[in-house]
């Protein structure tokens, strides 16, 4: 990372900024008024705005390993420029970024994200994800949506994700995913912090709704995960369906075949779950002793918890 700056007439002149790895790089240049670092009441020019242009034409996906340890390698060209305007309180972005036929290898995931196509348009306050798609095995994962930098929470974002026979392979999970999921704001009554009489205050939280089907799955977890309820408040309206050949297998812990499905509503703070996950055959190993399963099932009797009861 190298930068060349100059201070003149109460402005920072960003003459050149380069973030590079090997032959890949992101460049930026422009003007930053010092006024935007002052409170609005103390600004000499109340209309002061940034004007910085970020050039991604030479970035390429090969720069991703330098930006995050989650990516092992990337191949593919990036095209686009983004102009950063506005203030720190209300930034504005203009321009577009496109990727055509790229590939990325994510760490701990054996499946390569292939044929990556991206089309993002920045229009001031609004970021529009017109298309993001990638091949996963013989299937496809795609998404579209929008995000507002400054707006009311009832319309600030939307993300639509579709998985069409998407195939994932990793050490923990291998299988085929079909799904249609929408993430958008949800209005809800804040009973948790409500005091006294009257109606509770209405707030907004993310809502995840849709359906997901799993087929030909092999799950191999060396330890049983802890189901912590957490503090995040996310609305839920999801249907999970298990297709044939859902296999949980670890040579030291379990060998179980599952089927069934559940509907999850409510929120991550207080879920309500209907349905049954059945295990018609299998075994659990504990202290080197095998316990055979015969027509066991997981049901959720009490609302407000992700922990099931075993029947």
Where are the regions that the model predicts?
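Strand-loop-strand
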Residues: 1-27, 33-44, 50, 61-63, ...
């Amino acid at each position: 990372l190298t930068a060349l700056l100059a201070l003149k007439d109460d402005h920072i002149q960003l003459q050149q900024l380069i973030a590079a790895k090997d032959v890949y790089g992101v460049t930026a240049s422009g003007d930053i008024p010092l006024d935007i670092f002052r409170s609005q009441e103390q600004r000499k020019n109340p209309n002061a705005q940034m004007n910085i242009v970020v050039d991604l034409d030479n970035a390429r996906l090969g720069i991703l390993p330098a930006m995050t340890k989650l990516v092992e390698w990337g191949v593919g060209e990036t095209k686009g420029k983004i102009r950063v305007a506005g203030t720190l309180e209300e930034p504005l972005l203009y321009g577009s970024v496109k990727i055509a036929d790229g590939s990325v290898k994510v760490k701990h995931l054996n499946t390569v994200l292939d044929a990556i196509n991206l089309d993002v348009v920045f229009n001031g306050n609004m970021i529009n994800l017109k298309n993001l798609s990638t091949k996963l095995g013989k299937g496809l994962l795609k998404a579209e949506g929008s995000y507002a930098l400054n707006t009311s929470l009832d319309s600030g974002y939307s993300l639509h994700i579709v998985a069409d026979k998407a195939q994932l392979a990793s050490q923990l999970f291998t299988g085929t995913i079909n799904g249609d999921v929408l993430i958008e704001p949800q209005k809800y009554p804040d009973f948790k912090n409500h005091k006294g009489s009257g109606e509770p205050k209405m707030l907004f939280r993310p809502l995840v709704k849709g359906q997901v089907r799993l087929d030909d799955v092999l799950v191999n977890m060396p330890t049983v995960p802890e189901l912590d309820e957490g503090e995040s408040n996310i609305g839920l309206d999801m249907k999970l369906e298990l297709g044939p050949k859902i296999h949980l297998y670890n040579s030291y812990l379990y060998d179980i075949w599952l089927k069934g499905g559940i509907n999850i509503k409510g929120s991550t703070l207080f879920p309500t779950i209907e349905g049954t996950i059945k295990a018609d055959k299998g075994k659990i190993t504990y202290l080197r002793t095998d316990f055979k399963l015969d027509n066991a099932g997981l049901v959720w009797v009490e609302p407000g918890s992700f922990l099931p009861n075993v029947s």
